[in-house]
């Protein structure tokens, strides 16, 4: 075997994520000295069925690092980094649990990403080229979370994210520039109405003004868009993360109690009032039928499952059978390996489900999800506001890809 591709060793590092929590970085090195790194992100709002992180009782990842330096390094020694599926299958076998709890989804995804990057570098290819080959032709539309609520903020909004979607632009660079302008206009509006103190940023770079009602937040965002003349080019979205305001048999939102049926009517009202192109996790994570009913009522809105599917084909199959959503979030650390992530995206696309490659609220500067979105031809990428380095690293990577390789912007010819 060529020493350029043969794994010599793995090394684990305990690093810091954007929420001041400890996470793991893995370094893979071949005998020829080719090196690749992978970081594990972490969510604040987590699906009950996603891969379990391996963390120490005090929140650190010393045990995970030790596992990489010993068991994983020994087990993967001499493997060919180009054999991603074989390596990921080995990780899954070594773990031996359904929820990745022995090795940890965090340990596994950091290792899996590091293997991918090492192989790509050894071949002299860009990551997106290695992932997608000649299929990689488009830059995804960004979903920018510019106003935060829920578990991502310190205000009283129950809806977790208020999103802008720049669609009708010729280039990604134009789309991101318009989004920056809307973001800054929103900051000005918040300053005027509530004071500069409320322009502090949430976990994902969005603002967290002292709002309590969903419509107040949507009004602020829509006013920012319209004041710049972008109402025909920039659309809106929400991540409700509704499991967080579901209580036994009802939802508590905007100071009211809603049944699932009443909440469907409320979302329909919002979609009639605002250009809502996207709604994520509008119901609690086991309610496939309410997702389906909402999607059937909102023909021009991409109802999307995150906690509903947790990047797991078995859960997505249920959603497809019930026609629960037009879209699915893709978070590699929810499932634990690059191979399983690619299989999930392939399954979604074969069943006409749109894919949204997504960050987590606890991120690092690793920009691999940008390459993953391009390489898999995902329609969307969701990676926060156009601020904070762990968010902008992904946008800056997409700018590089567009300018260096001339790829087209997905929004230019995208139709619902």
From Swiss-Prot:
The keyword ATP-binding does not apply. Its cofactor is Mg(2+). Catalyzes the reversible conversion of 2-phosphoglycerate (2-PG) into phosphoenolpyruvate (PEP). It is essential for the degradation of carbohydrates via glycolysis. Belongs to the enolase family. Binds a second Mg(2+) ion via substrate during catalysis. It catalyses: (2R)-2-phosphoglycerate = phosphoenolpyruvate + H2O. Pathway: Carbohydrate degradation; glycolysis; pyruvate from D-glyceraldehyde 3-phosphate: step 4/5. Its EC number is 4.2.1.11. GO terms for molecular function: magnesium ion binding; phosphopyruvate hydratase activity. It comes from Sulfolobus acidocaldarius (strain ATCC 33909 / DSM 639 / JCM 8929 / NBRC 15157 / NCIMB 11770). (2R)-2-phosphoglycerate binds at residues 160, 331, 360-361, 382. Keywords: Cytoplasm, Glycolysis, Lyase, Magnesium, Metal-binding, Secreted. Coiled coil: none annotated. It is found in: Cytoplasm; Secreted; Cell surface. One of its GO terms (cellular component) is phosphopyruvate hydratase complex. The active site is at 204 (proton donor), 331 (proton acceptor). This is Enolase. It comes from the Archaea. InterPro entries: Enolase, Enolase-like_C_sf, Enolase-like_N, Enolase_C, Enolase_CS, Enolase_N. Mg(2+) binds at residues 239, 280, 306. PROSITE patterns: ENOLASE. HAMAP family: Enolase (MF_00318). GO terms for biological process: glycolytic process.
């Amino acid at each position: 075997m060529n020493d350029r591709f043969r794994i010599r060793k793995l090394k684990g590092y305990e690093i810091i994520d954007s929420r001041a929590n400890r996470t793991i970085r893995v370094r893979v090195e071949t005998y020829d000295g080719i090196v690749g790194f992978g970081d594990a992100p972490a969510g604040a709002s987590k699906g009950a069925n996603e891969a379990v992180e391996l963390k120490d009782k005090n929140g650190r990842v010393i045990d995970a690092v030790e596992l990489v330096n010993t068991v994983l390094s020994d087990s993967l020694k001499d493997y060919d980094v180009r054999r991603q599926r074989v390596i990921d299958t080995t990780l899954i076998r070594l773990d031996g649990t359904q929820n990745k709890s022995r090795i940890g989804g965090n340990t596994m995804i950091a290792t899996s990403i590091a293997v991918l990057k090492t192989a790509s570098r050894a071949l002299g290819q860009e990551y997106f080229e290695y992932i997608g080959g000649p299929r990689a032709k488009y830059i995804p539309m960004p979903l920018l979370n510019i106003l935060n609520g829920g578990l991502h903020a310190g205000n009283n909004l129950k809806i977790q994210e208020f999103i802008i979607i720049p669609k009708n632009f010729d280039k990604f660079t134009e789309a991101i520039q318009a989004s920056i302008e809307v973001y800054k206009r929103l900051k000005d509006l918040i300053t005027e109405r509530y004071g500069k103190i409320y322009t502090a940023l949430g976990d994902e770079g969005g603002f967290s003004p002292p709002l309590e009602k969903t419509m107040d937040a949507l009004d602020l965002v829509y006013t920012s868009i319209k004041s710049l003349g972008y109402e025909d080019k920039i659309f809106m979205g929400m991540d409700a993360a509704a499991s967080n305001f579901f209580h036994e048999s009802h939802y508590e939102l905007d100071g009211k109690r809603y049944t699932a049926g009443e909440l469907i009517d409320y979302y329909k009202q919002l979609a009639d009032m605002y250009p809502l192109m996207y709604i994520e996790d509008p119901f609690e994570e086991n309610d496939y039928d309410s997702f389906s009913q909402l999607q059937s009522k909102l023909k021009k809105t991409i109802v999307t499952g995150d906690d509903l599917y947790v990047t797991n084909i078995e859960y997505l199959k249920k959603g497809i059978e019930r026609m629960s959503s037009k879209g699915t979030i893709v978070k590699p650390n929810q499932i634990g390996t690059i191979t399983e992530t690619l299989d999930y995206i392939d399954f979604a696309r074969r069943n006409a489900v749109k894919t949204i490659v997504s960050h987590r609220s606890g991120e690092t500067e690793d920009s691999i999800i940008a390459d993953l979105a391009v390489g898999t031809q995902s329609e969307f990428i969701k990676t926060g506001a156009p601020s904070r380095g762990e968010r902008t690293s992904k946008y800056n990577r997409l700018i590089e890809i567009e300018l260096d390789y001339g790829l087209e912007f997905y929004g230019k010819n995208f139709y619902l």
